[in-house]
Amino acid sequence: MSNVLNSSILHSILSIESESGDCSRMADFLTTYCQGQGLAVTQDDMGNIYVTKGAAAAFPCIVAHIDTVHAITGDGILPVYIGDNVTGINPATMEQTGIGGDDKCGIYAALHCLANLPACKAAFFVDEEIGCIGSGAADMSFFRDCRFILQADRRGNADFVTDISGPLSSDRFQRDVKPLLTSHGFRFSHGAMSDVMALRDNGCGIACANISAGYYQPHQACEYIHLPDLLKTCRLMLDICRTMSRVYRFTPAKRSRPSRKRDFWPSSFWPSSDSWDWTPKAKPCEFCGQLLRDDDGIICAECETFELSSRL
């Protein structure tokens, strides 16, 4: 049912250890589960998984990444439910461990949409946490018959990211989605690197967005998921997929990379004037002093420290 979480599937996802560079456990689970539901499933050489349900002239598409930052211990993860929250425990040591809501919440949201829509596509990417490796090499032909691409890969419960170092979607898409955001308690926001950024930069040609998924304190042992917030995200995504039936074409304006002696700059963190927010809200990196945009979980482009400890 679309109005409740499938606790069995969610529990299974949360119990799986999956680390950047070793996503095979999650990939095997998703392949087996989706094939068991009668869905068309393919996997590319990178390990990315592509799922199609039903037939449509243009599909809604949901994407997620299947790696987490947490190292695989081999002990598994025991999801522990405390009221409306769930966190992780290492069953061997009985110590709290990262539940991996980033992006297991997104994986669940994709499966939730597949279960509740007559026609839908989903893609699950490897190794987002180490630079959008999977989505950066995705089969772009998979998205040619899609209307838009949604991802649930952001902490919190209210952000609808339409800009990652440049817009992810057209004004028409944002205008059409705004009433749905208002009714579900979401707002437009800027964000940091995620798979939809890589898809945009690789020319998917349609509107993309990244959405708060109900997880908090990501990348830490104390990470937890607030289940009502995850359900809130799933309801929004279903509403968008059911309501917004047109194809939302979008091609971003070309941008020039800064002249800098560096092999690779993820576009989310180009150190150029158009991608930095030089406002009083911006905070300096406490490790190197570089001024950062006021955005949770940002990677410092100078010293590559992942998160400021003051934001933990």
Report each predicted region and the residues it spans.
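His/Asp/Glu-rich mid-to-C-terminal helical/loop segments that flank catalytic regions of hydrolases
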Residues: 217-279
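N-terminal hydrophobic or amphipathic helices/low-complexity stretches enriched
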Residues: 1-16, 257-263, 268-269
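Cysteine-rich micro-motifs
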Residues: 296-306
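A non-catalytic alpha/beta surface segment that caps or lines the substrate-entry region
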Residues: 12, 16-58
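Active-site metal-coordination/substrate-binding segment of hydrolases
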Residues: 37, 57-119, 129
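Zn-dependent metallopeptidase/amidohydrolase metal-coordination segment
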Residues: 187-233
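Acidic/histidine-rich catalytic neighborhood of metal-dependent amide-processing enzymes
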Residues: 95-175, 188, 196
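Short functional micro-motifs and their immediate structural scaffolds
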Residues: 291-295, 308-309
